[in-house]
Design a protein with these regions (language model features):
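Flexible loop/turn connectors
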Residues: 283, 287-352
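Flexible loop/hinge segments that line or gate small-molecule binding clefts
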Residues: 138-177, 294-297
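Periplasmic-binding protein-like
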Residues: 69, 121-128, 147-152, 201, ...
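N-terminal secretory signal peptides
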Residues: 1-35, 47-49, 53-58
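Hydrophobic alpha-helical
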Residues: 129-143, 218, 236-298, 322
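Extracytoplasmic "Venus flytrap"
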Residues: 66-85, 89, 93, 98-110, ...
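Hinge/cleft segment of the Venus flytrap/periplasmic-binding protein
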Residues: 202-206, 324-446
Length: 446
């Protein structure tokens, strides 16, 4: 049953004494009555509407709002690219943003979260290195009514539903099929040139949920190529330096390798450096794949050294999570199926590289996205995710990882899948997806 708004919920702001009383209690010295009335009226309507629908009370941000981006580490080009997207989206939406480097340290990020709350952040975008602090950060976010979304590193089987309403979204690219696709490209190249052969893997951080799902996608692809053998793997810890050392070790153990499956583009860069130093010719006598679609990854494909990468586009991650924070700060609320989301990566090779370079690398001052169009607050009728965005299947995301003792599927998640909400969300987002992820920038003139 739809509940009606009760006029008694609204202060009598037509009476000057009521306005003055509210302003005095809020210590709003220097704020005009007109500005106070504009903000108070919107806040009252939003809060009353939320109450009538059974939602928690709504706190509207004044204009853009203030957010923080807790980055995993600036040692990775991916993170720098993602921060570019976050800052561009925040600027377009009028938000104040502060970006801080977590240096691959979950405890440091927890401290940074507390510091940003103390500094007045209303929302935090988290790019965690793992699941070490996510539960505590989510708990603090709910206690202090600070909006939170997270990407990549997390605690498998810990969902926003268990954390509370203020953990608004966990979102990552769908990595199983993405990493499967780039592995297929390497296997096909090895088969076409050598008729088969040995390959190795250089992974990310051991135990990281993204690292695990990428390895599962890789291993699934290898089932279709029995002549291609994975003979060894070592962790590259997501960065160039550690990956170069890992690749050097693998070369000493397996000198006859024909392919390398690198767990991201920074890892691939380190592998290429090690291979070249050892006398190999990447792209000719050994084929390498990466992941993420960083600027460096695209340029490496252009040079012929990297065969393929799964382009999830780090700028998109930054823009997507920033836009979500903006929307919830301004009164929009997600359905259950919108709180855990995937977006579709595109396998990038020389065949489709030019479109990527034009939009994301050689774009000059032209932004790759219409950031305001991503917002359901700014564009309630014609919003566009600008990528294939869809509800997450947590069994695909975390399959093969043991569930904690006593864990059960969150009620909100199972109900959304059972009652058709998840499928309806998938269809709705597909219908709104108009601006092609790999097409020209919507901001390009002419």
């Amino acid at each position: 049953m739809v509940k009606k708004l009760d006029p008694r919920w609204f202060p009598e702001f037509e009476q000057r004494r009521v306005v003055d009383g509210h302003m005095e209690r809020l210590d709003l010295h220097g704020v005009s009555r007109r500005d106070f009335m504009a903000f108070a009226s919107a806040s009252a309507i939003a809060s009353a509407t939320a109450l009538s629908l059974g939602y928690p009370s709504v706190a509207l941000a004044d204009k853009g709002g203030k957010m923080a981006h807790l980055m995993m580490t600036l040692r990775l080009e991916y993170v720098a690219n993602a921060d570019t997207g976050a800052n561009a989206a925040a600027k377009a939406l009028g938000m104040e943003i502060t970006s801080v480097d977590g240096q691959l340290d979950s405890e440091r990020q927890l401290n940074q979260f507390e510091q940003q709350m103390a500094a007045g952040a209303q929302a935090v975008m988290l790019h965690a290195p793992g699941g070490g602090s996510i539960r505590r950060i989510a708990e603090l976010a709910n206690q202090n009514k600070v909006w939170l979304d997270n990407t990549w590193g997390t605690l498998p089987w810990f969902t926003p539903f268990e954390a509370g309403d203020y953990y608004t979204m966990y979102a990552v690219p769908e990595e199983f099929s993405a990493h499967r696709a780039v592995t297929v490209e390497v296997c096909k190249a090895v088969m076409n040139k050598f008729g088969g052969g040995d390959i190795v893997g250089v992974t990310g951080v051991e135990g990281n949920s993204t690292d695990l799902i990428r390895s599962r996608g890789r291993n699934d692809a290898l089932k279709d190529f029995p002549e291609v053998k994975l003979v060894g793997e070592l962790p590259g810890k997501w960065n160039r330096e550690d990956s170069q050392k890992a690749m050097e070790d693998l070369i000493s153990r397996h000198p006859d390798i024909r392919g390398v499956i690198a767990q991201n583009d920074d890892v691939a860069d380190g592998c290429i450096a090690a291979l070249r130093a050892a006398g190999y010719r990447p792209g000719d006598d050994v084929f390498i794949s990466g992941a993420d679609g960083t600027t460096g990854g695209a340029e490496s494909i252009e040079r012929g050294q990297l065969l393929a990468t799964s382009a999830n586009v780090p700028q998109y991650m930054g823009a997507l999570l920033t836009t979500r924070l903006y929307d919830v700060l301004h009164g929009w609320r997600p359905r259950a199926a919108e709180r855990m989301m995937n977006w579709r990566s595109i396998a990038m090779t020389k065949d489709n590289l030019d479109a990527y370079l034009e939009r994301y690398v050689n774009n000059g001052d032209t932004e790759p996205y219409d950031y305001r169009r991503m917002s359901k607050v700014e564009h309630p009728d014609d919003w566009d995710p600008q990528a294939e965005l869809f509800p997450m299947d947590i069994d695909l995301e975390w399959g093969g990882i043991a569930k904690p003792d006593g864990w059960s599927y969150p009620k909100e998640y199972t109900e959304a899948r059972a009652n058709g909400e998840a499928e309806a969300v998938r269809e709705e987002y597909a219908a709104h997806y108009k601006i092609d992820f790999f097409g020209p920038s919507p901001m390009k003139q002419g």
